[in-house]
């Protein structure tokens, strides 16, 4: 059965999917949510955080539909997705099991994930906007927390570690 896995940025979703293409796909949300017109020369990571990105009409609907269709094929063991609360809520309302992997909130996590983001090419503005979410214990509404599987992990973990340790 295909597992839907949302994970905090920089946990190795793309890397794991590239290393395990027969079992895993990473559905990068920015490819569904924003037009790349004028930004084709940028990597996906560089593209994140650009304020001038043009939203794609119904991008979230298309992204959700792609997630559901990909799971329905049964081709993959893991479908990696973004961790937007509204997306997770929609999947939970549709009765889908969703695993959300988040590092324990700490200054160590903040340092590690900031360093990972910069190393992979994320813009500083993106890092400044995302990293503080490590410390938000209320990032997801209580009613959503009861419908998803939240997996907290040490700062040093990547998704490979989570899967190898059978935490999802």
Regions found by a protein language model. Give the residues of each.
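Conserved phosphate-donor/acceptor-positioning beta-strand/loop module used by diverse small-molecule
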Residues: 80-83, 94-116
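Conserved beta-strand scaffold positions in the cores of enzyme catalytic domains, especially
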Residues: 22-26, 97-100, 148-152
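Short, polar loop motifs at secondary-structure junctions
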Residues: 9-12, 82-87
């Amino acid at each position: 059965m295909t597992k839907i896995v949302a994970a905090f940025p920089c946990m190795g979703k793309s890397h794991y999917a590239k290393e395990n293409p027969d079992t895993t796909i990473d559905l990068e949300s920015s490819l569904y949510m924003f037009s790349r017109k004028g930004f084709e020369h940028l990597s996906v990571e560089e593209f994140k955080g650009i304020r001038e990105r043009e939203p794609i009409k119904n991008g979230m609907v298309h992204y959700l539909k792609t997630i559901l269709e990909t799971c329905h094929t049964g081709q993959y063991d893991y479908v990696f997705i973004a961790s937007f609360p509204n997306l997770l809520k929609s999947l939970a309302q549709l009765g889908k099991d969703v695993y959300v992997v988040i590092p324990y909130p700490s200054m160590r996590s903040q340092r590690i994930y900031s360093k990972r983001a910069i190393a992979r090419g994320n813009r500083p503005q993106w890092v400044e906007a995302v990293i503080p979410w490590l410390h938000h214990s209320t990032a997801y509404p209580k009613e959503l927390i009861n419908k998803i599987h939240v997996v907290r992990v040490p700062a040093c973990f990547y998704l490979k570690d989570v899967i190898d340790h059978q935490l999802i």
